[in-house]
């Protein structure tokens, strides 16, 4: 579930302080596979915590213990 507030996405993969693929500060380089869309996010953008990630044939979901869950299907509708 992704919470939408005033047109902005508030979820573990929304723009935040941390890189969702490395867990480092957001201004660090993103791995090539992640840039190509081949990797799901592994870290919460809001707090940098490691997320529980489940990859399925049709996408993925990721859950932060503090900021909730997001599903790739939910993100596809916002593109």
Swiss-Prot record:
Cofactor annotation remark: Probably contains an unusual Fe-S cluster.
Phenotype seen when the gene is deleted: The deletion mutant is unable to grow without extrabacterial biotin. The growth defect of the deletion mutant in biotin-free media can be complemented with biotin but not with another intermediate of the biotin synthesis pathway.
GO annotation terms (biological process): biotin biosynthetic process; symbiont-mediated perturbation of host innate immune response
Record carries keyword Transmembrane helix: no
Molecular functions (GO terms): iron-sulfur cluster binding; metal ion binding
Keywords: Biotin biosynthesis, Iron, Iron-sulfur, Metal-binding
Named cofactor requirement(s): iron-sulfur cluster
Annotated function: Required for the activity of the biotin synthase BioB.
Family statement: Belongs to the BsaP family.
Protein name in UniProt: Biotin synthase auxiliary protein
Organism annotation: Mycobacterium tuberculosis (strain ATCC 25618 / H37Rv)
Gene assigned in the entry: bsaP
């Amino acid at each position: 579930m992704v919470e939408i507030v005033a047109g902005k996405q508030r979820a573990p993969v929304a723009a935040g302080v941390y890189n969702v693929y490395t867990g480092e500060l957001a201004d660090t380089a993103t791995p090539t596979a992640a840039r190509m869309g081949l990797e799901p996010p592994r870290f919460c953008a809001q707090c940098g915590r490691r997320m529980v990630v489940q990859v399925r044939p049709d996408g993925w979901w990721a859950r932060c213990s503090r900021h909730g869950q997001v599903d790739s299907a939910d993100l596809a509708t916002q593109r």
